[in-house]
């Protein structure tokens, strides 16, 4: 689950992390009041959407007067902001964060994330903070520092100091910076984060350490024990199909392609998307119905796939273990009849009750193409939609 920048900063403030004073507004008529409230000669007007790259897309503006604060707020509110993370459709700006400006002496990048190679949390840092951090990571990986954190000990002072030394942070600010890192780590652990990113972390010209921007993602599996975090969820920023899928405990992620996929098991789902790409197609989604899905769950999964107007064909790839092939077949047939299937459908079934499942499909009178292998299915669906 993602949250907005202003929400992330409110959370970090509770953990003792220095952040700029700011006010969030939803109506341009509140812009002047917010500007007066932060009591700053320079204000930063920032579009609030669940995507990075706002600065390069014109979603962050520096205002030198209250008049400019109102002007920039009017320009941004209601605007569709397109960044490299939003896709071509972009995101509509429905909230603005107006916060105090500060004179920046130096920018850094600090983040906590899961290091899957080591199965531990990693502190990632760079002296090259700011809008171009992704280019730095791609072209100058030697500028990226990593500290692996022992979960039994947590982030230690010596690790924090080592990062500070490697970032060339002034000695007078090392204690403050280490304390900030430890507070970020505490938030990461206690709130079940999957990513906590500060970009940039800045040293101001009056020698303060401050988190100027913040991005936090949460592990959805931990939300049950963080109800305060769950309350921050903004459904307007989420894909409608993903919201619908979450109601039925389906793992669904929208993609940019035109071949809908329904698979059981995350590994098989990723392999299915890969093989579709291999044969020249583009998957429209990741969809894992799970190991013990009911007929109703399968039917709802099928409906969600078909609700995507980009979908020109569907590939169902099921290996029945706990999941029975006849249950999948019944769900597909019922959903196809209900929504009046009008796109090509390729089904590959293997495993428990496979013959019964195939019989159900054959007797359905639907235009279903069967496949013997995953590769066979991928080839057929790619050919059918061209």
Swiss-Prot record:
Protein name: Succinate--CoA ligase [ADP-forming] subunit beta
Oligomeric form and interacting partners: Heterotetramer of two alpha and two beta subunits.
Catalysed transformations (reactions): succinate + ATP + CoA = succinyl-CoA + ADP + phosphate; GTP + succinate + CoA = succinyl-CoA + GDP + phosphate
Residues binding substrate, per UniProt: 264, 321-323
PROSITE patterns to which the protein is assigned, alphabetical: ATP_GRASP, SUCCINYL_COA_LIG_3
Job of this protein: Succinyl-CoA synthetase functions in the citric acid cycle (TCA), coupling the hydrolysis of succinyl-CoA to the synthesis of either ATP or GTP and thus represents the only step of substrate-level phosphorylation in the TCA. The beta subunit provides nucleotide specificity of the enzyme and binds the substrate succinate, while the binding sites for coenzyme A and phosphate are found in the alpha subunit.
Name of the gene encoding the protein in the UniProt record: sucC
Pathway it works in: Carbohydrate metabolism; tricarboxylic acid cycle; succinate from succinyl-CoA (ligase route): step 1/1
Annotated residues for binding of Mg(2+): 199, 213
SUPFAM superfamilies: Glutathione synthetase ATP-binding domain-like, Succinyl-CoA synthetase domains
Coiled coil: none
Family: Belongs to the succinate/malate CoA ligase beta subunit family.
Record-level GO cellular component terms: cytosol; succinate-CoA ligase complex
Keywords: ATP-binding, Ligase, Magnesium, Metal-binding, Nucleotide-binding, Tricarboxylic acid cycle
GO molecular function: ATP binding; magnesium ion binding; succinate-CoA ligase (ADP-forming) activity; succinate-CoA ligase (GDP-forming) activity
Cofactor: Mg(2+)
Cofactor, how bound (note): Binds 1 Mg(2+) ion per subunit.
Binding residue positions for ATP: 46, 53-55, 99, 102, 107
């Amino acid at each position: 689950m993602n949250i907005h920048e202003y929400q992330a900063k409110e959370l970090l403030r509770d953990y003792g992390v220095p952040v700029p004073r700011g006010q969030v507004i939803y109506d341009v008529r509140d812009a002047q009041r917010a500007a007066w409230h932060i009591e700053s000669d320079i204000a930063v007007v920032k579009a609030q959407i669940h995507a990075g790259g706002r600065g390069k897309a014109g979603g962050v503006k520096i205002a030198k007067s209250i008049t400019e604060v109102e002007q920039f707020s009017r320009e941004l509110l209601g605007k569709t902001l397109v960044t490299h993370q939003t896709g071509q459709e972009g995101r509509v700006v429905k909230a603005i964060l107006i916060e105090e400006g500060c004179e920046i002496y130096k920018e850094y990048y600090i983040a906590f994330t899961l290091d899957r190679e080591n199965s531990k949390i990693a502190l990632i840092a760079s002296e090259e903070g700011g809008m171009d951090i992704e280019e730095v990571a791609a072209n100058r990986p030697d500028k990226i520092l990593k500290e692996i954190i022992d979960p039994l000990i947590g982030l230690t002072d010596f690790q924090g100091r080592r990062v500070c030394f490697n970032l060339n942070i002034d000695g007078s600010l090392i204690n403050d910076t280490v304390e900030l890192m430890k507070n970020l780590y505490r938030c990461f652990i206690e709130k079940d984060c999957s990513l906590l990113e500060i970009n940039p972390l800045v040293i101001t010209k009056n020698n303060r350490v401050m988190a100027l921007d913040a991005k936090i993602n949460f592990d959805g599996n931990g939300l049950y024990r963080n109800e305060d975090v769950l309350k921050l969820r903004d459904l307007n920023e989420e894909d409608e199909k993903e919201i619908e899928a979450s109601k039925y405990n389906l793992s669904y992620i929208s993609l940019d392609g035109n071949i809908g996929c329904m698979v059981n098991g995350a590994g098989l789902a990723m392999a299915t998307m890969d093989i579709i790409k291999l044969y020249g197609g583009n998957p429209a989604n990741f969809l894992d119905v799970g190991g013990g899905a009911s007929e109703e769950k399968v039917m709802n999964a099928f409906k969600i796939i078909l609700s995507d107007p980009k979908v020109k064909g569907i590939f169902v790839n099921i290996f029945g273990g706990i999941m029975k092939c006849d249950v999948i077949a019944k769900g597909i047939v019922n959903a196809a009849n209900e929504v009046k299937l009008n796109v090509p459908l390729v089904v590959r079934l293997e495993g428990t009750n496979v013959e019964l499942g195939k019989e159900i499909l054959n007797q359905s009178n639907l235009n279903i193409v069967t496949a013997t292998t995953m590769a066979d299915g991928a080839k057929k669906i790619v050919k059918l939609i061209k």
